Amino acid sequence: LDTTLSDQDRYPLKINDLVIMPINKEFAPEKVIWSNSPEYVITDLQCVGFNGDRFYRPAQQFGDFIEYTGSVMFVDPSGKGKDQTAISCVKMLNGNLYVTECLGLSGGYSDSVLEKISKIARENQINTILVEQNFGGGMFAELLKPFLMRFHPCQLEDVRNNKTKELRIIDTLEPVMNSHRLI
């Protein structure tokens, strides 16, 4: 009995569905083709998923490299305790989502964190920043505004969610990953 088969059905987000490739912050290929053929396995990047999980590079890239059609940064401010502020920069082109930057910042709501977020937004040419409303009722976004005005004026929106974080992550990523559109 191969128990890994049941594990694959139990967990909706699969590492194998990702497309792994170097990403330019300004341009991307018009079309990226995914394949889980053995010749596309990336062997020099450690995969820490289940047994049998692998990272795959694109099977093919078609068309010219063209500018992204949109960009967004999502910020999940650190809560109480020792967690970090999570930041993810995503760009869009032809139905694909390209993660150009993803990191965690220690330091809570300090000026250095707010400045770093603003500079990352500038480096990634972000159009819109979505900030998850935690317990402060929009306080983090208000603290971020003056730094954005100084380093990278862009649209800033508070996002309020009622679902648990894990379910939101799965609901957002599963359709994108299953169709091999997260790069």
Go through each PLM region and give its residues:
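RNase H-like, metal-dependent nuclease domains and their acidic two-metal-ion catalytic environment used
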Residues: 1-160, 182-183
